[in-house]
From Swiss-Prot:
Keywords: Cytoplasm, Iron, Metal-binding, Nucleus. One of its GO terms (biological process) is tRNA wobble base 5-methoxycarbonylmethyl-2-thiouridinylation. Pfam families: Zn_ribbon_CSL. Pathway: Protein modification; peptidyl-diphthamide biosynthesis. Fe cation binds at residues 26, 28, 48, 51. Residues 4-60 form the DPH-type MB domain. This is Diphthamide biosynthesis protein 3.
């Protein structure tokens, strides 16, 4: 069982669109991070690369659902929308 340093709402994170990663300041001076893909996969733990602390990310999992299929334009195929 993991021991979380804190529980933080996703709205309190900074989002980097280029890397599709959410960041939150860690007490050690670095940043906790979690990717959009991690959230889509149901992950809720953000880690710090510089220390052993982890935090639980509080978010609405329905906003990060991956796997919805949509018709592909001009094709007889379906695409997965993420």
């Amino acid at each position: 069982m993991a021991v979380f340093h804190d529980e933080v709402e996703i709205e309190d994170f900074q989002y980097d669109e280029d890397s599709e990663t959410y960041f939150y300041p860690c007490p050690c001076g670095d940043n906790f991070s979690i990717t959009k893909e991690d959230l889509e996969n149901g992950e809720d733990v953000a880690t710090c690369p510089s220390c052993s602390l982890i935090i639980k990310v509080i978010y609405d999992k329905d906003q990060f659902v991956c796997g919805e299929t949509v018709p592909a334009p001009s094709a007889n195929k379906e695409l997965v929308k993420c």
